Amino acid sequence: MLAYWRNMGSKRNNIKRYGLIGRNISYSFSRGYFKQKFETENLENCTYENFDLNEIEELNKILTKKNIYGLNVTTPFKREVVPFLDRLSPTAEKMNAVNTIKFHEDGTVSGHNTDVYGFEKSLLEIISTLPKKALILGTGGASSAVAFVMKKLNIEFSYISRTA
């Protein structure tokens, strides 16, 4: 479990480290986005790093680093990270997929899936009448969140992708 590693961190300095875990993530805009966000919000003690992993087991190396407060999770580790966590939010548990990891003061680590919330909220803000059918473009990590929302809203859907 990640709680062991969280407790290994020192709170001597007040730098709060956040980051993204995934594979082949050099393309990700997350580091730049959060760097700008931290600057805008005058959060001088926060940093955001990309942690490019080949295998989920490499996560343990990251967790020995000091002052990790949260991680975003991307492909292909959204499902693979679940066994490493102490608890899951209800949505993450239903999906068996996590895109956000929170490190708590008590040393425990929780997993959340914000893809579902974000997609559902965005959809309901722009569409007043829900369709009966939908087409999901792609079968990547976020497509499972879109499908989850489609099922929840009773919208019939199909996938289309290069590999499906």
Describe each model-derived feature in a short phrase.
Residues 22, 113-116, 123, 132-151, ...:
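Glycine-rich adenosine-cofactor-binding loop
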Residues 48, 134, 157:
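Hydrophobic anchor at the start of a short beta-strand
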Residues 157-164:
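Anionic-ligand binding region
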